Amino acid sequence: DVGDLKDKSFNQGTYDGVKLYANANSKSYKYYKPANGDKATDDDRYDAMKAAVDNGAEVVVAAGFLQAAALQKAATEFTDTKFVFIDGSPVDGLTNLAAISFREEQCGYLAGYAAVMEGYTKLGFCGGGGGTNDACCRYGYGYVQGAEAAAAEKNVNVEMNYTWKYGESFQPSAELQTLASGWYKNGTEVIFSCGGSIFDSITAAASANDAAVIGFDVGQS
């Protein structure tokens, strides 16, 4: 997907998991990065998978929903190779493709619940995917519900700002940092960031305003 192995998100978490498994089981592993970085196409992703298979990979692990088309093509062509699709959906008829998805709404619920129980009552949420990414939407829905549940228990009122506007590309931006900084200046105490590297924009705004951030995917402190 987009990003790199130091993105404090899916790529880093997936690669760390591959390394742990491989080292614990005396397996070899190698990272194949699609050409053109964040502008990679389906063909670029397929070429990276093909290179892995050509070099003898028995299992290919791909992270992120943008891998879907390339994975389907590769799994159809290389039937003797196993493919693992992190944050994806299964494809009918492809028995060599295993898809792993998550219940992001549960994670979001815990984040919202914990934030309010910690004493925060003015919350923010920034999601990736421009509002069309199911996983990021589930994080947001759970976050609101968790905050509401904790607020009811504590008998307090909670304010919530939320946006998916500047996270469509999952990349940091000056616009998102400005938006988050404005929230903080107007009283928002903590923002839950769900969308890959948009986390960098939120943390920059938080640092400038001595405020708090909730991360996701992997430890982002």
Locate the predicted segments by residue:
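A residue-level marker of the well-folded mature domains of exported/periplasmic proteins
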Residues: 1-221
